[in-house]
Swiss-Prot record:
It is an enzyme of class 2 (transferase). One of its GO terms (molecular function) is acetyl-CoA C-acetyltransferase activity. Catalyzes the condensation of the acetyl group of acetyl-CoA with 3-methyl-2-oxobutanoate (2-ketoisovalerate) to form 3-carboxy-3-hydroxy-4-methylpentanoate (2-isopropylmalate). It catalyses: 3-methyl-2-oxobutanoate + acetyl-CoA + H2O = (2S)-2-isopropylmalate + CoA + H(+). Residues 5-267 form the Pyruvate carboxyltransferase domain. This is 2-isopropylmalate synthase.
Length: 522
């Protein structure tokens, strides 16, 4: 009988470490809800002790998620374990994931400890975590480079202490598939209590082996795969879950395994992660890239026309990629737009219909026809703009050319006040940014700028993603319009609104801290 492989998603923990700018609580929740729709069994959503913001994110997600187990990371340190519990306790189902290095290199140079001391510390912290929950995962950090005798000792002790999942990370992406599989085979053969825990894999892609290593380990008896959507993660990234899941769906019968993932949600989830994280998906990316189902060779095209299975081992529809796209016009009513959103998989709670329809009408008036990719882009911007906006772009005007200095005049609403400012710059976008910075007095430094066409042709929407730095922190902004200068301006205003909200939160935390100090003094 086919056995289930548990899918453990770490996009919001390990995956986020690859991003230029940290995600907001709202952005993390959007991704968590998408992962829940896709059906991940466990989602690791943060490192609660690391910062108040991460604690809040984990707690917020733990309250909202009902159909997946929510997990928080913790070092083998008492305060980490306690913080993870406090953040997760509001969840319907949760897991505490604690870890400690086990390789000789890490023990000697990073921990400055010994293997017996590592085992003693791991056992103590696993027991502490078990006081809070019966679902505790222990990771042997750098397990791929840990001698098998040492690994067996650690794993046996961890299971005896109460760990229900044992994770063996290939932390630096060093092992080859057959080596990694041999580790799991040895653990199953040599650890006497191994049947009391689920063996888990966590692979990195430094040598391009992450997915191959994960599948090799599953073939050797692992029954949980840890990874991130789109392969996000430290350095070269984590195991790409969408690839691993579809490999199991397509070839799982050879390993006698399956997952409980809703495959129809894979494409949409990957797109959500890509947009929110500002990490474009390469065209040649397996499963979800724009070329994944494209055929340019004449021989291949002929074969596909005769029978798609000649050159396609899975279908676009199997990951939720719809091949038929309907276009709407300015004459399309609210019901038509709502119906199309439902057909694309969007529930009513995922967007504000009034705001979406207003944006749809404005776009339809500009370009005539609105396609599925336009609606998806509008829905994404709609989700990003639901927070209160202190700054709002009213109008702008630019003058530029090969023989004149670019000049921009920007009218911005700042709270209840309307302000206007003009500035020059190195091109129209820079001129607009100079004017906006003068109006807001934030002086945010542009770190990165990225323009992506949403659709095809001269009237395609242009999405601008920027990262700005302010007071040592990086913030992401996104804007969408058929005019790239307008989308650039909207992206900057979006980033500045995020900065403004962050400042409000910091001021509120400072106020609460002062009140607390005053009460303690009294």
């Amino acid at each position: 009988m086919s056995q289930q492989v548990i899918i453990f998603d770490t996009t919001l923990r390990d995956g986020e470490q690859a991003l230029q700018a940290s995600l907001s609580v709202k952005e993390k929740l959007q991704i968590a809800l998408a992962l829940e729709r896709m059906g991940v069994d466990v989602m690791e959503v943060g490192f609660p002790v690391s910062s108040p913001g991460d604690f809040e994110s984990v707690q917020t997600i733990a309250r909202q998620i009902k159909n997946s187990r929510v997990c928080g990371l913790a070092r083998c340190v008492e305060k980490d374990i306690d913080a993870a519990y406090e953040a997760l306790r509001v969840a319907d189902a949760y897991r505490i994931h604690t870890f400690l290095a086990t390789s000789p290199m890490h023990i000697a140079t990073k921990l400055r400890s010994t293997l017996p001391e590592v085992i003693e510390r791991a056992v103590k912290m696993i027991r502490r975590a078990r006081n809070y929950t019966d679902d505790v995962e222990f990771s042997c950090e750098d397990g791929g480079r840990t001698p098998i005798d040492d690994l067996c000792r650690v794993v046996e002790a961890a299971i005896n202490a109460g760990a229900t999942t044992i994770n063996i990370p290939d932390t630096v992406g060093y092992t080859l598939p057959y080596e990694y599989a041999n580790i799991f085979s040895a653990l199953r053969a040599r650890v006497p209590n191994i049947d009391k825990a689920i063996l888990s894999v966590h692979t990195h892609d430094d040598l391009g082996m992450a997915v191959g290593n994960a599948l090799a380990a599953v073939n050797a008896g692992a029954r949980q795969i840890e990874g991130a959507m789109n392969g996000l993660g430290e350095r070269a990234g984590n195991c790409a879950l969408e690839e691993t899941i579809m490999a199991i769906k397509t070839r799982g019968q050879l390993m006698n395994v399956h997952t409980r993932i809703n495959h129809q949600e894979i494409y949409r989830t990957c797109q959500t992660v890509s947009k929110i994280c500002n990490m474009p998906i390469p065209a040649h990316k397996a499963i979800i890239g724009s070329n994944a189902f494209a055929h340019s060779s004449g021989i291949h095209q002929d074969g596909v026309l005769k029978n798609r299975e000649n050159y396609e081992i899975l279908t676009p529809e199997s990951i939720g990629l719809k091949q038929v796209q309907l276009n709407l016009t300015s004459r399309s009513g609210r019901a038509a737009v709502k119906h199309r959103m439902e057909e694309m998989g969007y529930g009513e709670t995922e967007y504000n219909m009034d705001r979406l329809y207003d944006a749809f009408k404005a776009l339809a008036d500009k370009k005539g026809q609105v396609f599925d990719y336009d609606l998806e882009a509008l829905a994404f911007i709609n989700q990003q703009s639901e927070e209160p906006e202190y700054f709002r772009l009213d109008t702008f005007n630019v003058q530029s050319g090969s023989s004149v200095i670019a000049t921009a005049t920007v009218q911005l609403r700042c709270g209840d006040e309307q302000k206007t400012e003009a500035a020059t710059g190195n091109g129209p976008v820079d001129a607009v940014y100079q004017a906006i910075n003068r109006l807001t007095e934030f002086d945010a430094e542009l770190v990165s700028y990225q323009l992506t066409a949403k659709g095809h042709g001269k009237d395609a929407l242009g999405q601008v993603d920027i990262v700005v730095q302010y007071n040592g922190r990086k913030f992401h902004g996104v804007g969408l319009a058929t005019d790239i200068v307008e989308s650039s301006a909207k992206a900057m205003v979006n980033a500045l609104n995020t900065i403004w909200r962050a400042r409000q939160v910091e001021q509120e935390l400072q106020r609460k801290s002062q009140v607390k100090d005053q009460k303690e003094t009294v």
